[in-house]
């Protein structure tokens, strides 16, 4: 991935964030965050009190009240700034995507073939179902499916990858994205969306936050923060008559300062920024999430369904051996295997053709000149082959070929069964070749498990995440590779229906399931999974069914997606712990300052030895505002992530952010008190 990463504090972003922070001071904007709305209301009230004191309408220290009011406004501004900075980083990422959208004309065909008559129309007028012709050098005008042709496509504007990709009709690489450019040849594309609904439009809307809604965990935490705010508001409201009855009424300014310091303003001010930054970090990994809910769900996932090919193994299986059945010549097996693979464009199919050529000098033959019919592989049949000169040759998985043989009145030989087991026990994939009802033998396909993947699965296991390998291989091959890779479980001979059933089974047990997919046959399982990462190179159906799209089309990215989701949840939890813990230190600063005149015994709580009641209150309010600024980098970058169990993670958080939340305010408030005293403001 070559997408440029934004620095944490770009000067342009800082200026824009400051401007947006001021704009967010409106009551309508503040009302969306109840905790900060209370601070905003306190700021307005103390500002009015300051003006009244300056004009002599009421008695009191205008300087003290004015400084309190100023720092309350700073508290609101700093919270606005954190949110605006997070949104600004996302908008900057979106601007690079907007540059991809260009006003252009499209060749809309009157019939679904490349030589049909075409009309030049603005790309914005294209509708779902329209057929367009795109030639070399053109920008693809809409999202769609290739129905004819094949071409090299530059998708760097979206994926950040400079290497072109092949898009062609009739397979899992038929999906194209509007805004990408054709480098060679031509494509006939059926538009799959209306204007404003394209993948680019959805990416931009998501990244800019236009479709951002609070996630369930955010809503639950917001309710908790509101409840705490109401409790502290009621408690503070009772303190005025309580102190007045004692003969020394506490001023409204002090009560407002006390309330603001007691309510959880730190997490209240950073909560929105954490959510926006989480989605931004996901985009930084070249993954587009359709909502914050998807990112959050990634953090709660406890079952990963991982395709074997390309995720656990390198995915470049190569034919390495022909093992004929008893009574069959190896050359005969190789010839049949090559014929069955002539029109198979997969790496495995091409390797079979090449191996037959190397072993027995069997030359490739043109399928069309042979007047043969190629039978393509499907997820349901799990075999492919060729019909030629009254010969019906098939190659495929053991079970598929066994059913084929038995349905044609044949018998599956015991020696071939043994050869299949021997190949599978070595971790290779056996393909069986059959002509009619006669089994000819086995092709050995070798694949290599990715380096370091076993250690990554061990880390996931520490975190309580179960890994399940999904493969179309037979159980013996699957078991051998699963043991080598270190996964917890596997699903062998997988079909789309089996994947869907497995996901539902785990969900019925109360688990959250994540998976990847790229084909139309993956769409039902992607739609069912809690976190569904569709490959950008996959079909439109897969991308619509998933709640994330990986622009790099790298199935291994699912593990990184889970890490980012967990980091976002950890960041939110850590800052919540810190916010609530640092309230304790503020009690020791403000409570003695506010009520020591009425109850001298409370001076015993002044463990920090603060200079005066006024300096104590000012120090607490100033610290309350500054801590938001100091925590913005942590909210945007996320806390440092380590794969730990839930209990170990809880202990780490309580130690770092619970104890830190207790200690840091004591130090910070004392330092501010000393500075205020030196400046003569206390």
Curated annotation (Swiss-Prot):
Q: List positions binding ATP.
A: 344, 348, 377-384, 395
Q: Name one Pfam family in it.
A: Hydrolase
Task: Point out the coiled-coil segments of this chain.
Answer: none
Per the UniProt entry, the Enzyme Commission number(s) are 7.2.2.6
Main enzyme class: translocase
InterPro entries according to UniProt? ATPase_P-typ_cyto_dom_N, ATPase_P-typ_P_site, ATPase_P-typ_TM_dom_sf, ATPase_P-typ_transduc_dom_A_sf, HAD-like_sf, HAD_sf, P-type_ATPase_bsu_IA, P_typ_ATPase
Which compartment or compartments is the protein found in?
A: Cell inner membrane
Q: Which residues bind Mg(2+)?
A: 518, 522
Name the PANTHER family for this protein.
POTASSIUM-TRANSPORTING ATPASE ATP-BINDING SUBUNIT
- Subunit text: The system is composed of three essential subunits: KdpA, KdpB and KdpC.
Q: What does this protein do?
A: Part of the high-affinity ATP-driven potassium transport (or Kdp) system, which catalyzes the hydrolysis of ATP coupled with the electrogenic transport of potassium into the cytoplasm. This subunit is responsible for energy coupling to the transport system and for the release of the potassium ions to the cytoplasm.
Name recorded for this polypeptide:
Potassium-transporting ATPase ATP-binding subunit
Source organism per UniProt: Salmonella agona (strain SL483)
